[in-house]
Amino acid sequence: ATCRKPSMYFSGACFSDTNCQKACNREDWPNGKCLVGFKCECQRPC
């Protein structure tokens, strides 16, 4: 299963998974992906 949460650090529209992941890494979450609506979501195994 994958746990998900919105990134606290990412601001603006999310177009790059790499930038999103960098923001999530600052929050100690290993993965980040841009979602529909240009939101950055952090993901990790539960």
From Swiss-Prot:
Pfam families: Gamma-thionin. One of its GO terms (biological process) is defense response to bacterium. Coiled coil: none annotated. The keyword Disulfide bond applies. Transmembrane segments: none annotated. InterPro entries: Defensin_plant, Scorpion_toxin-like, Scorpion_toxin-like_sf. Keywords: Antibiotic, Antimicrobial, Disulfide bond, Fungicide, Plant defense. Gene3D superfamilies: Knottin, scorpion toxin-like. It comes from the Eukaryota. Leaves and flowers. PROSITE patterns: GAMMA_THIONIN. The keyword Iron does not apply. Disulfide bonds join C3-C46, C14-C34, C20-C40, C24-C42. Belongs to the DEFL family. Strong inhibiting activity against C.beticola and other filamentous fungi. Little or no effect against bacteria. This is Defensin-like protein AX2.
